[in-house]
Amino acid sequence: TETYFHPSNWGLWQVQLANFVQHLTWEFARRCKAEERADCATPAAWRLTLAIRREFVLTLRTVCLLSMFSKEPITTLASQSSLKRMAFLHPELILPPVLERSFSSLEALETTQRTTAVISTLAALSQALVSPGVYAAGPKHLAPLLYLCLPGIDLNDPMKTLSTCMLILSVSLSVYVADGTSAGDDGDAGATLVPLDDANVSSRGAEDYAARLSTAEMDVWSG
């Protein structure tokens, strides 16, 4: 069924399928949060395991990454909502492929529709991306992404401009924008291993250091 989510295979079915996936991720995320509560009434044997969560995200990841580039705005919004929920469930499975597509699209601005879709998706996922507690490798990408998005402010393309401004606004409301290169480390917490993607890990100290280095030119944004 993945072919039905491909942007070039557009039809009314895309909206229905994207909405179906959106409802699936909503119900799944709601159940995950409910089972984390101390007063959860679901028996332990019936609760969602980490393996089930991982398989759920892997199953729906590809179709959402395809439909986020749909030419139909409702389909795109539904896919972004699904990706956002899954990014909080398993950020190491969702954010790396989104970032890979984002950098490749923003570095080649010839495809306007694809660029707009990427920027709006980044705006939707910005909270997960800039939160070290969610995805430790995310903050180091913030400054490069902001600079790559600047050409998105285009008076001849209102939708792309709106998406770019929403990304900048969302980031500005989520983090304090400043030069953090002189900030200290977290001591013993820096040795904690954190996932980068599906196969690789790093230390929190290394990711925090990379994030601090990436903010060397952030004073321009906070002035």
Predicted features along the sequence, with ranges:
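Very long, low-complexity or repeat-rich scaffold/adaptor subunits
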Residues: F5, P43, A143-L146, D154-T161, ...
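Alpha-solenoid helical repeat scaffolds
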Residues: T1-R101, E110-H141, D198-G223
